[in-house]
Amino acid sequence: MYFTKVHGLGNDFILVNAGTGQGFTDDCSTLAKEVCDRKFGIGADGLVLLYDSGVADVRMKIVNSDGSEAEMCGNAIRCVAKYLYDHGIIKKDEIKVETLAGIIVPQIIQQEGSVKAVRVDMGEPRVERAEIPMIGPPGQVIGEELAVNGKVYLVTAVSMGNPHCIIFVPDLEDISLTQVGPQIEVHPAFPKKTNVEFVQVLGPNEVRMVVWERGAGPTMACGTGACAVAVAGVLNGFTERMVTVHLPGGSLMIEWAENGRIYMTGPATEVFSGEYTVYNPSRR
């Protein structure tokens, strides 16, 4: 199996161009667990598979390191756009990518023939409780109390095609992400589980965040999470519609435009390529 290792701000993926998918494994969950293992596999936060699409330029499938499938990933889609453009597979400034969250359109920002950054139209956020989804009465979830193991957090829920639970705090240093993150991820209020973001507001156009990703745990960056944080900042009156989001792996520029759509701009990096031997023949 030929692969390319890529990352967006340290959120890393194993990218495989599966084409028609003919002859490729149906057991992507087991494959992802194997190749994403950082001690016995290649090591990554997730496996990204590219297939031919009948409705877009390409179809992207994302499988987390725990084998669960994700609807969408902002860092992964920037990496996909860079890979397709730099390798001459799709030489267009705008690439239509089919995902479980709908068709997403990354825009190439190039310099001297290669991709410098990628601006992605992430679509419109969903803020109604049922769209997250989150258990409870109809309406938006903005600064709502959520009890977690005897402690109460004020949460804001946003969907970017995948669920996000955002919590604003005075200081990120006071948060034990590895303890609280997994507790909220599987909280019964979220029937499909949730990504969890803790956010410190630095100013009306600047925030810091850390993320516990559903199915992956703590990661260096989360593109959809940064978009959800930008929306939550506006809904709570903490930030303006253009905000720089600082993550452990670097920064993303997020704009919630007046047309209601979210635009994310950030880098993508190709690390290396190789061939991986999948030892179980049923997974080849």
Swiss-Prot record:
Sample GO molecular function, one term: diaminopimelate epimerase activity
UniProt site (Could be important to modulate the pK values of the two catalytic cysteine residues): 164, 213
PROSITE patterns reported in the protein's UniProt record: DAP_EPIMERASE (PS01326)
GO cellular component assignments: cytosol
Pathway(s) annotated for this protein in UniProt: Amino-acid biosynthesis; L-lysine biosynthesis via DAP pathway; DL-2,6-diaminopimelate from LL-2,6-diaminopimelate: step 1/1
Catalytic activity reported: (2S,6S)-2,6-diaminopimelate = meso-2,6-diaminopimelate
Matching Gene3D superfamilies: Diaminopimelate Epimerase, Chain A, domain 1
Any single GO BP term: lysine biosynthetic process via diaminopimelate
Keyword entries, A-Z: Amino-acid biosynthesis, Cytoplasm, Isomerase, Lysine biosynthesis
Cysteines paired by S-S bonds: none
Assembly mode: Homodimer.
Protein family: Belongs to the diaminopimelate epimerase family.
Function: Catalyzes the stereoinversion of LL-2,6-diaminopimelate (L,L-DAP) to meso-diaminopimelate (meso-DAP), a precursor of L-lysine and an essential component of the bacterial peptidoglycan.
Protein name (record): Diaminopimelate epimerase
Organism name: Desulforamulus reducens (strain ATCC BAA-1160 / DSM 100696 / MI-1) (Desulfotomaculum reducens)
Gene name of this polypeptide: dapF
